[in-house]
UniProtKB/Swiss-Prot annotation:
It is found in: Cytoplasm; Nucleus. This is Enolase-phosphatase E1. It holds the Pfam family Hydrolase. InterPro entries: Enolase-ppase_E1, ENOPH1_eukaryotes, HAD-like_sf, HAD_sf. One of its GO terms (biological process) is L-methionine salvage from methylthioadenosine. It comes from Lachancea thermotolerans (strain ATCC 56472 / CBS 6340 / NRRL Y-8284).
Length: 217
C-alpha cells in the first residue's frame, strides 16, 4: 500500500476509546459550574453562543449525548488544558502508535471531532515511563469539525486533501469508525479500520482493511 501522507483518527485508533468518555468527559463535567460562572472573556463569548437559559444543563446534555458541537469542543479544550498542564490528565497513546508517529517516512496528520486545541494538548502530554512525551514535533497538522467539517461527510476529506496538497488517493486514513471510512473512501482516500481493545465490533470488518497494530503498516 503506497501513500504520501497518513491521516489518523484519535479515539479508538491511537488511544483507547474509553479515554475520552471515562477520563476526559468526567474531568470536564466537574468543571461545568465553574466554567459557567467564569469571567474570562473567551469563555463568556463561547457560552453566549449557546443561546439557552440553562447553559450548564445544556452543556451536560450535550456531553451525555456525545453531541459533536463545535462550541462545546472549544470549551472542553480550554478546561482540559488546565488538567494536562497540572498533571491530572495524561494521554494513553498506544505504544505502536507512538512508534509509528515518531518514525513515519511520510507526513502524519490528525483528524478528530475534538478541537485542534484539544488534539494538540493530547499529543503534548502523552503518558510514558518518564512522565510525559511530546509527540507534536512529529505531527504535520491537525483538523477538526470547525476547520474541515463533520467526519462522516466526504466533503470534509476532500477539504483536508486539498489543504495538505496531496490527491486523496495519496492519503491513508485510519479510523475505528466505518462511517468515517466510507466517507473518506468516496473521495478516493485509502482507508484502514483500526481494531483496538474496547472498540465496537464492525460488521463486515474485513472489507474495511482492518489493522490491529501499527507495526503492520
Amino acid at each position: 500500500m503506497a501513500y504520501a501522507a497518513v491521516l489518523l483518527d484519535i479515539e479508538g485508533t491511537v488511544c483507547p476509546i474509553s479515554f475520552v468518555k471515562e477520563s476526559l468527559f468526567p474531568f470536564f463535567l466537574k468543571q461545568v459550574d465553574t466554567l459557567c460562572s467564569s469571567q474570562d472573556l473567551q469563555v463568556q463569548r463561547l457560552l453566549t453562543q449557546f443561546q439557552v437559559d440553562d447553559v450548564a444543563g445544556h452543556i451536560r446534555s450535550l456531553v451525555a449525548r456525545d453531541v459533536k458541537d463545535p462550541i462545546l469542543k472549544q470549551l472542553q479544550g480550554l478546561v482540559w488544558e488546565n488538567g494536562y498542564k497540572d498533571g491530572q490528565i495524561k494521554a494513553p497513546v498506544y505504544d505502536d502508535a507512538i512508534k509509528f508517529i515518531k518514525n513515519s517516512d511520510v507526513p502524519v496528520y490528525i483528524y478528530s471531532s475534538g478541537s485542534v486545541k484539544a488534539q494538540k494538548l493530547l499529543f503534548q502530554y502523552v503518558e510514558s515511563r518518564s512522565n510525559t512525551l511530546d509527540l507534536r514535533p512529529f505531527i504535520k497538522g491537525y483538523f477538526d469539525i470547525n476547520t474541515s467539517g463533520v467526519k462522516t461527510q466526504s466533503e470534509s476529506y476532500a477539504r483536508i486533501a486539498n489543504n495538505v496538497g496531496i490527491k486523496p488517493n495519496g492519503v491513508l486514513f485510519i479510523s475505528d469508525n466505518p462511517f468515517e471510512l466510507d466517507a473518506a473512501k468516496i473521495t478516493g482516500m485509502q482507508t484502514m479500520l483500526a481494531v483496538r481493545p474496547g472498540n465496537s465490533e464492525v460488521r463486515d470488518a474485513l472489507k474495511y482493511n482492518p489493522v490491529t497494530n501499527f507495526d503492520d503498516l
